[in-house]
Design a protein with these regions (language model features):
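Transmembrane helical segments that form the transport core of multi-pass membrane transport proteins
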Residues: 100, 130-133, 137, 150, ...
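Interfacial loop-to-helix junctions that mark the boundaries of transmembrane helices
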Residues: 36-47, 67-72, 97-111, 225-234, ...
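Membrane-interfacial helix-loop connectors
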Residues: 34, 82-91, 95, 107-108, ...
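Structural signature of hydrophobic alpha-helical transmembrane segments
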Residues: 40-53, 108-119, 162-171, 231-242, ...
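Hydrophobic alpha-helical transmembrane segments
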Residues: 51, 76-77, 114, 148-156, ...
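Hydrophobic mid-bilayer segments of alpha-helices in multi-pass membrane transport proteins
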Residues: 48-58, 68-93, 110-122, 173, ...
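N-terminal secretory/membrane targeting signals
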Residues: 1-31
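Juxtamembrane and boundary regions of transmembrane helices in multi-pass small-molecule transporters
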Residues: 186-190, 194, 202, 206-207, ...
Length: 441
C-alpha cells in the first residue's frame, strides 16, 4: 500500500516537473550553446525535459500490471519526444547532422537485435505449435515423481533450457508443468515457481541466446561467443544456493497423475534440428567470417521457411490421395495448419517494440551526455566491481534491458572479467524481486 502511494507521489512530481518545464518558452532554449555530441544539453532545460519524459514513461511501464497499458507504448512515444527535442535544439546550433548520425547508429543497433530475436521467437513459436513443449510437460507430469524430485527437475531443466531458448519461454513452460502437477498444493506451486525463475535467469546468463542482455553484449562484440560459457559455474552456483535453501520448504509428498499423454506433431524433431543448425550458422558467420550474427539467424529463418514449404507439399499430396485412415487423418490435421509466417506474426511484438523504445530513449540520453556523467561516477569513482554489482541490484528494480544497454552505451574501459561480471549480475539480479525479470513477472 505504501509502495502504491509512493508511486503516485513520484508520478505527480514528474508530471509537475515536466509541466513546469513545458511552460518555459522553448525559443529561449535554442539560442544557448550546445556542445558537439550533445554534451552541452546536460545542463540545458531540454536535457531536463528528456529525463522527465523518460522517467514518466518508465513509471507507466512499471505500472503495466495495474493500468494494463502495454509497456511498449509509453517508451516508443518517449523515444520520439526525446530525439525530437534533441534534434530541434541541435538544429539551431548547426549540429543537426550529428543528431541524425547518432539516431541512425542507435536504430541500426536495434534493427540487428530485433531481427535476431524475431528469428529466435519464430523458432520457439514453431516448436510450440509442433507441441514440443507440451510433450515434454506431459512426460514429466505422469512419471510419478515426488514434489521434491519435480522441484529439482523443473528447476534444473529451466537452467538447461534457457540458454538455448530464452528465460521467459522456459519459465512459462516449466511453471505450466508445476501447475499441472501441483494443482491445489499452493505451497509446492509457489516454491517451485520461484525456483524455476531463479534457474531460468541463472541459465540464461551464461549463453548469448539465454537473455536479451547477453545477446546485446555478444552483438556489441564486447565478449566472444565462447567467453560466456566461463560463467557456467558462477551461474550454476547462483541457481544451486537458493534451490538448496528452498528445498526444505517443498512438501515431501507425491502428486496425482491427471494428464493425458501428448505426442509431438510431425516435423517437430526436424524443427529442433534446424534451430540448432541456425545457431551454428549464426556463430560461424560471426566467428569465422566476421559477419553480424543476425545474418546467420536470418539464413536460419530461410531453413525453416523451406522446411515449412516441404511440409505443406507433403500434406497436400496426402489430402489429394484421399487416404482417410485414422492414423493418417490425425497426421493431416496436425501438419496442414503449420505456416512460417503465422509463427512470425505470433512473436512477442510488444517486447520487440518495447526494446526499440528503450534503445532509442537510452541512446538519446546518451547523446545528451547523461550516460557519460553516470559512467564517470560509477566506473571512475566507485570502481568497476562496485559499479557492476550495483548494476545487478538495479536490474531487480528496473528491467535489465535498459540497464545493460546503458552500460554498453557508456562503454567503460573494463577487463574481460569485469564485462563477464556485469553480464552475470544483470542476468541474475532480476531474481531478487518478482518484477526484476520477464520470467519473474
Amino acid at each position: 500500500m505504501r509502495q502504491g502511494k509512493a508511486g503516485i507521489v513520484i508520478k505527480r512530481l514528474v508530471i509537475m516537473h515536466a509541466a513546469a518545464l513545458g511552460v518555459i518558452p522553448v525559443t529561449c532554449f535554442a539560442n544557448e550553446t550546445i556542445g558537439s555530441g550533445g554534451s552541452g544539453l546536460v545542463s540545458h532545460p531540454i536535457g531536463y525535459m528528456s529525463i522527465a519524459v523518460f522517467l514518466l514513461a518508465y513509471i507507466l511501464v512499471a505500472a503495466e500490471e495495474f493500468t494494463h497499458l502495454r509497456k511498449s507504448k509509453p517508451v516508443i512515444i518517449a523515444a520520439g519526444i526525446i530525439w525530437g527535442l534533441v534534434a530541434w535544439a541541435s538544429a539551431h546550433s548547426g549540429n543537426g547532422h550529428a543528431v541524425e548520425e547518432a539516431a541512425r547508429h542507435n536504430l541500426l543497433e536495434y534493427a540487428e537485435l530485433m531481427l535476431f530475436l524475431l528469428v529466435a521467437m519464430t523458432y520457439i513459436n514453431a516448436m510450440e505449435e509442433r507441441r514440443v513443449f507440451d510433450a515434454l510437460r506431459s512426460w514429466l507430469v505422469c512419471r510419478r515423481f515426488g514434489f521434491r524430485a519435480l522441484f529439482w527437475m523443473t528447476g534444473t531443466l529451466a537452467f538447461l533450457i534457457s540458454p538455448i531458448a530464452d528465460n521467459l519461454t522456459t519459465a512459462l513452460l516449466m511453471c505450466a508443468v508445476v501447475l499441472a502437477v501441483g494443482g491445489s498444493n499452493s505451497r509446492f506451486v509457489s516454491v517451485a515457481c520461484v525456483n524455476i525463475v531463479v534457474g531460468a535467469n541463472a541459465g540464461g546468463a551464461f549463453s548469448p541466446f539465454g537473455d536479451i542482455t547477453t545477446l546485446m553484449v555478444w552483438q556489441k562484440g564486447v565478449l566472444g561467443f565462447w567467453a560466456f560459457f566461463s560463467l557456467f559455474i558462477p551461474a550454476l552456483v547462483n541457481y544451486l544456493v537458493p534451490a538448496a535453501i528452498l528445498h526444505f520448504a517443498v512438501p515431501d509428498e507425491y502428486p496425482e497423475c491427471r494428464a493425458e499423454k501428448i505426442s509431438m506433431k510431425p516435423g517437430a524433431r526436424r524443427i529442433i534440428g534446424l534451430f540448432l543448425l541456425t545457431i551454428i550458422t549464426a556463430v560461424s558467420f560471426h566467428n569465422f567470417l566476421g559477419l553480424p550474427p543476425v545474418i546467420g539467424m536470418l539464413t536460419g529463418l530461410g531453413y525453416l521457411q523451406f522446411f515449412g514449404y516441404l511440409l505443406k507439399r507433403a500434406d497436400q499430396r496426402l489430402l489429394k490421395g484421399g487416404n482417410t485412415a485414422d492414423s493418417d487423418a490425425g497426421r493431416v490435421g496436425d501438419v496442414v495448419p503449420f505456416d512460417v509466417f503465422s509463427r512470425v506474426a505470433r512473436a512477442e511484438w510488444d517486447t520487440l517494440l518495447f526494446f526499440y523504445g528503450v534503445v532509442m530513449c537510452v541512446g538519446g540520453l546518451g547523446y545528451i551526455g547523461y550516460l557519460a556523467l553516470a559512467s564517470e561516477v560509477m566506473y571512475s569513482q566507485w570502481g568497476a566491481t562496485t559499479a557492476n554489482i550495483v548494476v545487478g541490484l538495479l536490474s531487480s528494480i528496473v528491467d535489465n534491458i535498459p540497464v545493460m544497454f546503458a552500460v554498453l552505451t557508456m562503454n567503460p574501459d573494463m577487463s574481460t572479467g569485469q564485462w563477464l561480471l556485469v553480464t552475470l549480475t544483470a542476468g541474475v539480479g532480476g531474481s531478487l524481486l518478482s518484477i526484476g525479470s520477464a520470467a519473474g513477472v
